[in-house]
Regions:
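…primarily DNA-binding HTH/wHTH and HhH modules…
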Residues: 280-304
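Basic, amphipathic alpha-helical hairpins
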Residues: 198-212, 232, 236, 253-262, ...
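Structured interaction and signal-relay segments at domain junctions
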Residues: 2-5, 10-92
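Append "Primarily bacterial transcriptional regulators
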Residues: 215-224, 228, 232, 266-273, ...
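Terminal helix-turn-helix DNA-binding modules in bacterial transcription factors
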Residues: 234-274, 295-304
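Juxtadomain coupling helices with adjacent low-complexity linkers
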Residues: 1-23, 108-185
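Short, Lys/Arg-enriched, Trp-marked, Pro/Gly-tolerant hinge/linker segments that flank
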Residues: 171-202, 206, 214-221, 234-246
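Sensory/regulatory domains in signal-transduction proteins
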Residues: 70-126, 160-164
């Protein structure tokens, strides 16, 4: 599948987030999305929940495992329901769920969160999750922050999820026609690979301002540094350090374009301890210095 196919889906998901405040997550129940390595840096980024509540909980081994078991429970619920429904995750997060089928097999789901639902029950679940994590009850404040819209617009959610689901079904169909997947089979290794990469990228996107080491990311993903490094090289064709620097440079370009901050301040804000190293990395990646990039943006000759 050509990358621009996934670019269209990613743009649609980004629009739904900016227009409606929805958090869209793609569930792959059979491992078909991990068949192409390029997907790890496109639709694969939508496999994990990135809200701070979920990110905090998943640092704990027991809750990480509970989260993975929840995916299987969700798959079973999708197979039973066979149409969209609103469900409550074990950690107190309500989601609009749109099952994706190929024939009679449920291959995935499009999940949309960000709205309150069944508040009392979900508050109890959230408190239980905090207790299981042995965390400060103040963590519950992050649970409240997950609600970015006042209510679920199920009609709009069904329309948007149906379109994304159709893209996913088409992709699965093409994989099947090329003999890359077989109907009814589950590719657990692909599921695990994409899940790890998605969580690693989520960690980088949420921690780019801080000093990040490969060991920190591996710890969050509950795997070894060597395993994570191998996944990055094989699927992203870049090292962990290179991906971290790319994320920081992307943020730096936005700051250069949208603010009047000094270059040295932007370097520090983006996690580069040495402004000279920041300028070196920036020039290596964009072919110009940060100051020249800012000037070109203001003259309309470059894009962030």
């Amino acid at each position: 599948m050509e990358l621009n196919y996934w670019d269209g889906i990613m743009q649609s998901i980004a629009y739904l987030r900016s227009r409606y405040g929805w958090r869209v997550v793609i569930k792959d129940f059979v491992g078909f999305l991990g068949k192409e390595s390029a997907i790890a840096s496109s639709i694969g980024l939508c496999i994990s929940h990135e809200c701070e509540w979920c990110m905090k909980l998943k640092t704990h081994d027991a809750l990480w495992e509970r989260c993975q078991r929840g995916n299987m429970l969700l798959r079973n619920a999708c197979a039973r329901q066979r149409c969209w429904f609103i469900g409550n995750a074990w950690c107190g997060i309500p989601e609009f769920v749109f099952p994706v089928f190929y024939g009679d097999q449920v291959i995935g789901a499009v999940c949309i969160g960000g709205f309150p639902h069944d508040d009392e029950r979900n508050r109890v679940r959230a408190r239980r999750a905090v207790a299981l994590a042995g965390s400060d009850p103040a963590l519950l404040e992050h649970w409240k922050d997950t609600f970015t819209v006042s209510k679920a617009d199920t009609q709009a959610m069904a329309a948007a999820s149906g379109a994304i689901g159709a893209w996913l079904t088409l992709y699965y169909t093409q994989l099947k026609e090329f003999g890359i997947v077989r109907e009814g089979e589950i590719y657990r290794a692909n599921t695990a690979k994409l899940l790890t990469l998605s969580h690693a990228m989520a960690f980088i996107r949420s921690s780019w301002k801080e000093e990040i080491h490969a060991a920190d990311i591996a710890r969050f993903c509950h795997c070894s540094v060597s395993h994570l490094s191998h996944l990055f090289k094989k699927n992203l064709q870049r090292s962990i350090t290179e991906v971290i620097e790319e994320e920081r440079l992307t943020r730096a370009k936005r700051m250069l374009a949208d603010t009047d901050m000094r270059v040295t301040d932007i370097a520090m804000a983006c996690g580069f301890g040495d402004p000279n190293y920041f300028s070196f990395v920036f020039r290596r990646g964009s072919g110009m210095t940060p100051s020249a990039f800012r000037a070109s943006i203001r003259k309309g000759r470059a894009l962030p």
